[in-house]
Amino acid sequence: MVREAAMLHIKEGLEQEFEDAFRQAAPIISGMKGYITHSLSKCMEETHKYLLLVEWETLEDHTEGFRGSSEYQEWKALLHRFYTPFPTVEHFQDV
């Protein structure tokens, strides 16, 4: 299992619109091969910051399967306009 972690900085004032768009986008990612689960958490100190955690069966399920898919283009169209700057995405595994 691989855990994807993305720190999302949302343009200030667009937080609610982002959350609504994320609810629309969630079924896209949850239907992908290798997807296990995800969570989106809002920072309490900086309300324009969110932490997205996604669990995948393999790294390639995310980096090749999801990112190389037409579904990723839908995800991107719904969400990428909210990011400033574009998020750093890292992958972790349990030890």
UniProtKB/Swiss-Prot annotation:
Q: Which InterPro entries match?
A: ABM_dom, Dimeric_a/b-barrel
In this chain the ABM domain maps to 2-92
Pfam families assigned to the protein according to its UniProt record, in alphabetical order: ABM
Ranges in coiled-coil conformation: none
Q: What is this protein called?
A: Uncharacterized protein YczJ
Tell me the organism: Bacillus subtilis (strain 168)
Report which gene this protein is encoded by.
Answer: yczJ
